[in-house]
């Protein structure tokens, strides 16, 4: 069958030009907190408004493992009077932001796969959040790269990258295409509340891409042995922003239309599901955890990954076997596991690895690959 000869034949990565350290972020956030508490001192004293608490780099690193993140714009994101990135609006005849960074990551993946636009049959943009409803960003990228065929957008929150690769594999298996470019533009700072102590430190911006191909001739190809997907509905990770807001009989505050999560519930509910899914997948393939040389896990929180890997592997796992990019990139939505794979892939011929994403939805996808 076709599905036995489908490969990830190349990956790509685009990184924004600006970085923010935890110390820089804390200086900004704590200045905002001080200003907020001063400006609202009477309301705080009367109990009508809750006083905000400052934060620290040490707290952030312990709680998440994050030390740094890349961002699309830095100055306004760190301005205590603004607290979000600010970018110029673009004319509809200009390439959109997501398409622009998607083209850059896509070209990197194409170069690493040894393919050209003429070789590609389809473009899938799969991301945690899209900047518009239509026309599809994938079709815009398709046009910019000069690719014939088709394109579409999809969103599965934190698992969008792996679900996108799985969709590409399904399209190839069905005979719709032979080579598909999957792109994951993640401008996560745009839907982050940087005024919130619980979330202001979490996100970073990035774009990843992968070439999924039938019968690849790439010198650095990885056969996809299996994909396993699972979704379970939950409101514990939620973003309310959407076109229905426009017609609802409600006036939303800005923070109501941004990322929200109940972190403790996510930890308690998602982590066991990830362990169960991976164990079931390995059992189906008659594999054990010892057969997996590397694990490229979702990069949301180092403590989640430690818990999952300790359960799977009966103890601590070294960073070479399960690379961590959280310290440099922060949570990049759905892109983290592919960043880890792109930067820290050390498989030798015949060795197997596992790429896994999980989070909002809830959604989980695990992809098992083998180096050829």
Features from the language model and the residues they span:
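Flexible, glycine-rich active-site loops centered on histidine and acidic residues
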Residues: 176-207
């Amino acid at each position: 069958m076709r599905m036995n000869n489908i490969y990830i034949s190349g990956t790509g990565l685009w990184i924004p030009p600006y970085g923010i350290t935890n110390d820089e972020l804390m200086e900004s956030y704590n200045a905002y907190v001080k200003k907020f508490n001063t400006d609202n001192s009477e309301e705080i004293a009367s109990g009508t408004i809750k006083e905000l608490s400052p934060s620290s780099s040490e707290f952030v690193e312990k709680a998440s493992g994050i030390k740094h993140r890349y961002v699309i714009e830095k100055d306004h994101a760190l301005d205590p009077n603004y607290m979000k990135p600010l970018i110029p609006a673009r004319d509809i005849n200009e390439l959109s932001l997501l398409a622009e960074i998607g083209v850059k990551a896509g070209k990197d993946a194409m170069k690493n796969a040894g393919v050209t636009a003429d070789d590609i049959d389809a473009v899938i943009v799969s991301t945690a959040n899209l900047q518009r409803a239509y026309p599809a960003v994938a079709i815009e990228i398709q046009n910019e790269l000069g690719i014939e065929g088709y394109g579409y957008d999809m969103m599965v929150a934190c698992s969008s990258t792996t679900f996108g690769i799985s969709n590409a594999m399904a399209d190839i298996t069905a005979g719709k295409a032979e080579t598909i470019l999957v792109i994951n533009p993640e401008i996560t700072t745009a839907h982050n509340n940087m005024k919130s102590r619980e979330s202001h430190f979490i996100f970073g911006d990035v774009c990843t891409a992968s070439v999924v191909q039938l019968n690849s001739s790439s010198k650095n190809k990885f056969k996809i042995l299996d994909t396993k997907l699972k979704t379970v509905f939950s409101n514990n990770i939620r973003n309310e922003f959407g076109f229905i807001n426009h017609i609802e009989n409600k006036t939303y505050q800005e923070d109501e239309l941004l990322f929200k999560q109940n972190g403790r519930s996510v930890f308690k509910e998602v982590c066991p599901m990830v362990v169960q899914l991976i164990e079931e997948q390995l059992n189906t393939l008659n594999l054990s955890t010892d057969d997996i040389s590397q694990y490229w896990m979702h990069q949301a929180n180092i403590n989640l990954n430690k818990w999952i890997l300790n359960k799977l592997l009966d103890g601590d796992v070294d960073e070479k076997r399960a690379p961590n990019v959280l310290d440099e990139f922060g949570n990049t939505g759905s892109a983290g596991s592919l960043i880890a794979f792109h930067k820290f892939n050390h498989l030798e011929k015949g060795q197997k690895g596992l790429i896994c994403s999980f989070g909002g939805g809830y959604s989980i996808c695990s992809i098992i690959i083998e180096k050829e």
